[in-house]
Structures are given as C-alpha cells and as structure tokens.
UniProtKB/Swiss-Prot annotation:
Part of the 30S ribosomal subunit. Keywords: Chloroplast, Plastid, Ribonucleoprotein, Ribosomal protein. Probably a ribosomal protein or a ribosome-associated protein. This is Small ribosomal subunit protein cS23. Belongs to the chloroplast-specific ribosomal protein cS23 family.
Length: 103
C-alpha cells in the first residue's frame, strides 16, 4: 500500500501554518501539529520533525522543506489588497499536491 506525505497549510491574515499528514490508502493521519510562521520558525520546526523520523527519506524531506519555503515566500509576497481566496486559488494551482485551508 502506497504511503504519501501531504503538506497542509492554514492561510491566515497575519500568519501561515503548516502541518504534515500521511495518507495510507483512503485514510489520512496527522503526523505533526500546525507549525506557525512568523510567530515561530515553522520551517525549522518541520525540519527538526523530519530529521527525527528515520522512515522519511532525505529526498522527501528536502522536497517538503522546499515546498514549505516556496509557500511561505508566496504568503509573504502576496498583495494584501487582493482577496485571500484568489491567493489560495493561485497557490493550489502552483502546488497541486498540498492542501490549503484559508479564509
């Protein structure tokens, strides 16, 4: 049975949060809590989690962390005059393998 790692983002006005889920078959199980940015270093917290899990490959870890970096950068650079739904839609198009929950 294929195991898939899924990044889930919570898009908020003043912060963005990320967590990691695992999909096995039709079931999705949370692996982490939400790590928030900029209140804390969500990227560093996820890196620490990934390094502590020997079953997650280095390649998967690098890909996940790169995606987190790109999404956080996208969130930082967004036009705050544009409705967040448009940003979230653009993000889902750019990263079809992630889940984005937002306002």
């Amino acid at each position: 049975m294929k195991k898939e790692l899924i990044l889930k983002f919570l898009w908020l006005e003043k912060s963005i949060a990320v967590c990691l889920d695992q999909k096995v078959g039709d079931s999705i199980t949370p692996l982490t809590e939400f790590f928030f940015w900029p209140q804390k270093d969500a990227w560093e917290e996820m890196k620490n989690f990934l390094e502590s899990q020997s079953w997650i490959t280095q390649s998967d870890s690098v890909n996940l962390l790169n995606n987190i970096t790109e999404v956080i950068n996208f969130w930082q650079e967004r036009d705050t005059n544009v409705i967040d739904r448009k940003h979230i839609s653009n993000l889902r198009e750019k990263f079809p393998d992630i889940i984005v929950i937002g306002q």
